């Protein structure tokens, strides 16, 4: 993320997610952007005490190939809703255009879209579109939940300018609301609710945040060993049956070129006897002393999925201390997954 000071005194902050392998699920991009931006903006705003000054707003914009894609659609909506304040409009709407899933191709489609907007504006008689009506429009017009990245890179930008936010901790919730408003059906129809951000801010109660994480997100981190390969080359995959992650520890320093097997060694069972006796995770990520810009390219370039903890570490170069504390507090005892069956059989034969 790189903050840029504007002449008006505002600060724009952006998080870029790069894709080198074609289309990627937009939900993945959104979740990574939320994690990164919430952490960084919270720290920056707390340091500058920005919330003691003028109120701030956020808008969510997706760029493809470095070109802003939302301005044309915002202008169309401004024409259809003359009463709508421009800042309110930009705060609530984000449009995906170009080679992506959402755009208006024909005059007929444009007329239909503007008609929907006009009906809502007349019915509400307000200066903004309420969330339910906005979602109904996007459900009809945004059919594909995948953002096709045909250019060299895509950029996710969150800007805050003029709408009030009570505290820095409210940033994550605001971002989640904006993202859910532009996704068809939000982040899913699970009764557990939508995305909740996980940050590494020291004074944030992560337990309350992480408890509400969408199960789809949690499932991505439930990994187990593949019995068809040796322990040192096991591939990570989703486990629908395992209850929680089985991570052991990290031994060495961060390196972008690192083989993932040494980054996330939860499929290694050298310390099995200790884990069997104590059922507790002793995460020992080694913190880097120098500061660096978060690098999401390590996630795109990694062929195997990572656990949530190592994913955070690879991007930010520091351990997710609060996430680890929460995990150990909640699942540290009597929740360790059993080792693969072939590993159990091997130990029996060696006795």
From Swiss-Prot:
Protein's GO biological process: cell division; mitotic spindle assembly checkpoint signaling
Biased composition annotated in UniProt, kind: Polar residues: 1-14
Phosphothreonine, modified sites: 211
Localization per Swiss-Prot or TrEMBL: Cytoplasm, Cytoskeleton, Spindle pole
Example of a GO cellular component annotation carried by this entry: spindle pole
Record key words, sorted: Cell cycle, Cell division, Cytoplasm, Cytoskeleton, Mitosis, Phosphoprotein
Compositionally biased residues, Basic residues: 232-249
Principal place of residence: cytoplasm
Modified residues (Phosphoserine): 100, 106
Disordered: region residues: 1-20, 223-249
The family this protein is said to belong to: Belongs to the IBD2 family.
Entry function: Part of a checkpoint which monitors spindle integrity and prevents premature exit from mitosis. This cell-cycle arrest depends upon inhibition of the G-protein TEM1 by the BFA1/BUB2 complex.
UniProt subunit comment: Interacts with BFA1.
Name of this protein: Protein IBD2
